[in-house]
């Protein structure tokens, strides 16, 4: 099949997590449950923050954005997978695959940058508490979120623009449960040097530098906490940073786990299972981490659910 000039009619085959027919109902039920929990959990976080005036602060503004990104990240991957399992049709069109590649890069970039912005917010709150509301004013908060979205859009568009010049003329089977750029590049029969170079460069810039920013912020936070004389002040500072630090550890831990698994094994099934942790499990767990470890969010959720129950 000569597909190089017919990408509009090209279809890829997503092999999924397993080709065993007996496992498909279990996989469908598991991923449907995780997706519903992800959407409901993150939606509750957004509603709790928007309905409680005490949470109308920079920290929770960034958190509501993070929850929205987590919903979108899962939505760009899981529903298509569920449809493929239910219809027993593993095909995905070239344009749908292109769209999935775009959003599967876009939302993790937003996650990375938002977590970095949140680390800076905690740094200002702990190290410069008297000037916190002056520094983290609504204009700056809006600008920071806008810049993260702009970087995500431009970076993802750059990847997609290079991908659209690729020629596919051989195997169209993707040994994964969604269209991921690295797998698409392996199927191309044209030169992918620029694509691969851009991936490594952007991974360094948008992966390593934000992590260094987070590490720097928390090193300064730790230094400030050690200098505090009040045990109550230390406890309050630790409680405000604990949930964010847990989410950062989970996000980067699963992300590094996927890259490590890809480096040490050629088993596509093992890589796919590792990717589940990064793409599905992490967005699902984030609202639980914030609601269980943050008293303000827990209280807002309790009030929201109480009001909802009284209306029934």
Curated annotation (Swiss-Prot):
GO terms for biological process: regulation of DNA-templated transcription; signal transduction. It is found in: Cell membrane. The chain crosses the membrane at residues 26-46, 55-75, 100-120, 140-160, 198-217, 238-258, 272-292. Pfam families: 7tm_4 (PF13853). It is a multi-pass membrane protein. Glycans are attached at residue 5. This is Olfactory receptor 7D2. It comes from Homo sapiens. The lineage of its organism: Eukaryota, Metazoa, Chordata, Craniata, Vertebrata.
């Amino acid at each position: 099949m000569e597909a190089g000039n017919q990408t509009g009619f090209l279809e890829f085959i997503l092999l999924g997590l397993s080709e065993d027919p007996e496992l498909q109902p279990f996989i469908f039920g598991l991923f449907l449950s995780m997706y519903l929990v992800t959407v409901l959990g993150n939606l509750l976080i957004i509603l709790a923050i928007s309905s409680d005036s005490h949470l109308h602060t920079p920290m929770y503004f960034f958190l509501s954005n993070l929850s929205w990104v987590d919903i979108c990240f899962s939505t760009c991957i899981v529903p298509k997978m569920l449809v493929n399992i239910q219809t027993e049709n593993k095909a995905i069109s070239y344009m749908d695959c292109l769209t999935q590649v775009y959003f599967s890069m876009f939302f993790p970039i937003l996650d990375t940058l938002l977590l970095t912005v949140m680390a800076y917010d905690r740094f200002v709150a702990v190290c410069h508490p008297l000037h916190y509301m002056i520094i983290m004013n609504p204009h700056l908060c809006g600008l920071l979120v806008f810049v993260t979205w702009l970087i995500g859009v431009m970076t993802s568009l750059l990847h997609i623009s290079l991908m659209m010049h690729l020629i596919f003329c051989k195997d169209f089977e993707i040994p994964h449960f969604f269209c991921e750029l690295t797998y698409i590049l392996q199927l191309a029969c044209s030169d992918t040097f620029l694509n691969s170079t851009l991936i490594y460069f952007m991974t360094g810039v948008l992966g390593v530098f934000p992590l260094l920013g987070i590490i720097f912020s928390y090193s300064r936070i730790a230094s400030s906490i050690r200098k505090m004389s009040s045990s109550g002040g230390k406890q309050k500072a630790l409680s405000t940073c604990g949930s964010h630090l847990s989410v950062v550890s989970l996000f980067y831990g699963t992300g590094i786990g996927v890259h490590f698994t890809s480096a040490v094994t050629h088993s596509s099934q093992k890589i796919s299972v590792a990717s589940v942790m990064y793409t599905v499990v992490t967005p699902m767990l984030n609202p639980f981490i914030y609601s269980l470890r943050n008293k303000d969010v827990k209280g807002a959720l309790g009030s929201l659910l109480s009001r909802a129950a009284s209306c029934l």
